Amino acid sequence: VIGGDICNINEHNFLVALYE
């Protein structure tokens, strides 16, 4: 993907945790 993947992944994991 684009630069700043780690931030995006952390944000994605956080949102996934909310929906799980």
Swiss-Prot record:
Annotated localization: Secreted
Primary location recorded for the protein, binned into one broad class: secreted
Entry superkingdom: Eukaryota
Gene Ontology biological process terms in this record: proteolysis
Enzyme class at the top of the EC tree: hydrolase
Function: Thrombin-like snake venom serine protease that coagulates human plasma and bovine fibrinogen by hydrolysis of the alpha chains (FGA) (minimum coagulation dose is 60 ug on fibrinogen). Has fibrinogenolytic activities, and degrades preferentially the Aalpha chain (FGA). Shows amidolytic activity toward N-benzoyl-L-Arg-p-nitroanilide, has a higher activity than Cdc SI. In vivo, intravenous injection induces defibrin(ogen)ation and a loss of the righting reflex and opisthotoxins, together with a typical gyroxin-like effect (18-20 minutes).
Protein name: Thrombin-like enzyme Cdc SII
Source organism (scientific name): Crotalus durissus cumanensis (South American rattlesnake)
Lineage: Eukaryota, Metazoa, Chordata, Craniata, Vertebrata
